[in-house]
Amino acid sequence: MEVAKTRYKIMADALRKSGRNISFGICEWGDRKPWLWGAQVGGQLWRTTADIRDKWKSLQPVKNARELHGTGAGILDILDYSLDYAAYAGPGHWNDMDMLIVGLYGKKGPSGDLGGVGCTDTEYQSQMSLWSIMNSPLAATNDVRKMNAETKRILLNEEVIAINQDALGKQAVCKIKNESWNVFVKPLANGDFAIAVLNRTDGSQNSKINFADLGLNGNYEIRDLWEHKVVGKGKKWNGKVKSHETKLFRLKKI
């Protein structure tokens, strides 16, 4: 770790001396826990895991994050190994969950290695939702000259991007975590909250979210950021979530 810290600090110092505003991303794949020291040595973002592949999850079980180098990390793997680092993120220093694979559809190349056979549009939309609420830098890697309608819809959703770019800079915290569900809460600069509801299972499920269970008391207006409309008001949300889908809501106190 100390060798890595020394080397990255040398690079950060050189970038500062250039007199230009340059973002410095630390990439050692999370092996040396850069969230603990990345900002200290001058980094603005640091990778949390092995490289992402174009798939939902690793097809082989892994015991720790390092094993993802061999099995290939999918969307769900990177999410799971990035849940505990919210305290280290904020304006000017971010946990980088790697690139967006939205719209790749199994394209050959590094993203297609280690079982990267592609994802469904539902899974790509989930990545956009999850990376946004987790404040990960958003870097599209598809060919923007040849985007289909679904890829454009996912990548260009201004309401979703606004959650990622919110000035408060708070990373979401996972309030519910089990084999079937993840539920995330992220406070926003204007007092609203973003909530993401991920169905981890291979089938559609009905979900009932009581906002009080998430630490949010009172009544809220519930806006679905993918449907672009208000879908309810009150102290809870009920609805169906498709397999591997992530619902993303903005809650406004009423």
PLM feature spans:
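Extracytoplasmic, non-cytosolic globular domains
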Residues: 1-30
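Extracytoplasmic/secreted cell-surface and envelope-processing proteins
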Residues: 1-9, 32-37, 56, 205-206
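Glycan-recognition surfaces
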Residues: 20-138
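Carbohydrate-binding surface patches
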Residues: 125, 131-134, 139-141, 177-216
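Catalytic cores of secreted or luminal carbohydrate-active enzymes
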Residues: 126-175
